[in-house]
UniProtKB/Swiss-Prot annotation:
Protein name: Guanine nucleotide exchange factor MSS4
GO terms of molecular function: guanyl-nucleotide exchange factor activity; zinc ion binding
Residues that bind Zn(2+): C23, C26, C94, C97
Family, similarity comment: Belongs to the DSS4/MSS4 family.
Gene: Rabif
Source organism per UniProt: Rattus norvegicus
Length: 123
């Protein structure tokens, strides 16, 4: 999606999500509209798979993603689970179908939770 399209369709003038954020696989609601800030930061996320396969760390395949929703409090999420620690990172997964990672949380920064726009859908 082009930056201008992104700004108009998904990001409000205040930089917040205009639409609800949903799991791409099962449609479960991850975030309500207006609860996250748009952020550009390069983060590596492993390829999408079920939660138990994420914590073994044996599969380095994945993507460097740049566009994210930034949430500063884990209790803002509607339906998100967290993996066990993988180094100093916890990956975010859908709490209903356990597919992920849809996002990333560094344990060094207690107030930053990133959800990759490419790993979720919007409604």
């Amino acid at each position: 999606m082009e930056p201008c399209e992104l700004q108009n369709e998904l990001v409000s003038a205040e930089g917040r999500n205009r639409k609800a954020v949903l799991c791409q696989r099962c449609g479960s609601r991850v975030l309500q509209p207006g609860t996250a800030l748009f952020s550009r930061r390069q983060l590596f996320l492993p390829s999408m798979r079920k939660k138990p396969d994420l914590v073994d760390g044996s599969n380095p395949d994945g993507d460097v993603l740049e566009e994210h929703w930034l949430v500063n409090d884990m209790f803002i999420f509607e339906n998100v689970g967290f993996t066990k620690d993988v180094g100093n990172v916890k990956f975010l997964v859908c709490a209903d179908c356990e597919i992920g990672p849809i996002g990333w949380h560094c344990l060094d920064d207690k107030n930053s939770f990133y959800v990759a726009l490419e790993r979720v859908s919007h409604e």
